[in-house]
Swiss-Prot record:
Organism, as annotated: Brucella melitensis biotype 1 (strain ATCC 23456 / CCUG 17765 / NCTC 10094 / 16M)
Compartment(s) of residence: Cytoplasm
Binding site residues for GTP: 17-24, 86-90, 140-143
Main location: cytoplasm
Protein name: Elongation factor G
One term of GO molecular function: translation elongation factor activity
Matching HAMAP family: EF_G_EF_2_B
SUPFAM superfamilies according to UniProt: EF-G C-terminal domain-like, P-loop containing nucleoside triphosphate hydrolases, Ribosomal protein S5 domain 2-like, Translation proteins
Role of this protein: Catalyzes the GTP-dependent ribosomal translocation step during translation elongation. During this step, the ribosome changes from the pre-translocational (PRE) to the post-translocational (POST) state as the newly formed A-site-bound peptidyl-tRNA and P-site-bound deacylated tRNA move to the P and E sites, respectively. Catalyzes the coordinated movement of the two tRNA molecules, the mRNA and conformational changes in the ribosome.
UniProt-listed PROSITE patterns: G_TR_1, G_TR_2
Amino acid sequence: MAREYKIEDYRNFGIMAHIDAGKTTMTERILFYTGKNHKIGETHDGASTMDWMEQEQERGITITSAATTTFWQGRDGKKRRFNIIDTPGHVDFTIEVERSLRVLDGAIALLDANAGVEPQTETVWRQAEKYHVPRMVFVNKMDKIGADFYRSVEMVGSRLGAVALPVQLPIGAENDFVGVVDLIEMKALTWDGTIGAPATVGEIPADMADKAEEYREKLIELAVEIDEAAMEAYLEGTMPTNDELRALIRKGTIEVKFHPILCGTAFKNRGVQPLLDAVVEFLPAPTDVPAIKGIDVKTETETTRESSDEAPLSMLAFKIMNDPFVGSLTFTRIYSGKLTKGVSLENTVKGKRERIGRMLQMHSNSREDIDEAFAGDIVALAGLKETTTGDTLCDPLKPVILERMEFPDPVIEIAIEPKTKADQEKMGIALNRLAAEDPSFRVKSDEESGQTIIAGMGELHLDILVDRMKREFKVEANVGAPQVAYRESITRAAEIDYTHKKQSGGSGQFARVKIIFEPHDGDDFIFESKIVGGSVPKEYIPGVQKGIESVMGAGPLAGFPMLGVKATLIDGAYHDVDSSVLAFEIASRAAFREGAQKAGAQLLEPIMKVEVVTPEDYVGDVIGDLNSRRGQISGTEARGIATVVNAMVPLANMFGYVNSLRSMSQGRAQYTMQFDHYEPVPTAVAQEIQKKFA
């Protein structure tokens, strides 16, 4: 089976938006107009094709990025292949957004015409800047009360610090919004609002003629700056033709010099088709963006993979989902080469082989089996054993690791327990499945209490995972209050000489160990044996190490795991009959418990690196508030029109921060935080914690 669409005719793009900007409705409309969907699902009544997890339909927010393939015939009569990646719009899911931005070539940023640029839009826009993603802006909901296209355009400049390039103007607003002026063709496009109706092309309304001329003039001035020859011609009085103008806008958009702005209302079916034409005309094909960089596994040097079927195969796994019919699905973007069913590939991150069994092309709620896929494709692979999000799969003869995605450490933990015995086993399976899908979610069990602890990126993040457990895996669970992950360590050296003896008829137990416990700079545990002359036989030494390691998980103060301890076995004694590995294990365990007390145990707390991005007006409040949370401000800097405040703050003081920040800045500031290091807890605080956990 040969390639059906040339790679130049692919558009891999996503739609990024604030939580209520109408993204799901827009995606639905796109799927309808591109012929994949016969009945439109409205988020208003909770039935939409792209949001395919129940909670999303209930909460009306998009959580998982589903990838969809569809087709559109452009203005030139040629069909293009669209791969649309749906991205979530809630701040606790920004990890999903980052993940999908990695595999996109371009994006449409949706704005709500009434609200303009909202806080979440700023966050996602910044993430897209980081990956240098070409973007267009669609000002949606033009039919809403208070819709203001011109204010939204102004906010793209003032709030996002980006260059806005309107290529359309709205005709009317709110209830009177009927269509748009196309500033390239200088025609009016109007719609009667019936679903799927084509636009009526007519003359620009007389009362808008001057405004249209003024905006077209601005459009041309910005566009010709992209190209020297066009600039010279323009200065000599030669205007670019409409096709030349489109080519200039395309070039500037792909180079992220400016962002074309369109408008309409997806819900009322006005402005959708011109947006699809703009995707073809302005957003990049895989061949228009720089080749993806990676590390050559054999030489450890940087290498690239061109978007071509002839290049060695390389692909990135960017999402894992559980499908009720197919089981685990790994969504991958093929950057180079050609993938055939049945081949065996190398997972270079894990150093394991994977065989490609079933390959699926996904529509948001249906799927088709395929036998091969090409550079630029986004495919779902069923039944991969080793691959997790962010892994590279490639040709075993030309191994490469495409840039690793970096996932922040979870910052919040809660204890979770099954309601009934029957739920116990199901809960284990459910949590492991969810952790495989989402690298920012971790599961562990607390040795002391035997409780299962789940950790994630925020309170909403964990809420939704617990909810999914209930629905998808039918597990009922009780959830505790959020907790901080404390640690313990020692502050000075201590030497312990401990003898373990037990005699009760038959063979007894005997072991004596002399160990020095001391602090060291790392977080790990170091064990060293300095036994000479066989006072402890070689075969018993691993027992000493194992004994100490087995109790490192619960420190003497409040039962938290120990960090940064070095143990040196310097002497000991054994008995020919009564000594055993087990006896030495028991002796070293007791020696450690005694040693940790003597070596000045102390409590450590996680310190978070907090970055707050806030409008100038709220900087004072933000800094004052961080100081009151035992925070240390490490600096402030200007970023575009906002100010970035960097600080180190104990996690224990960051619970509920999202709400305080929201009210402090009227929802305009955002923050990110990730774990940085552990630090001793101040004495007063430490005593409270010990009381609580004693």
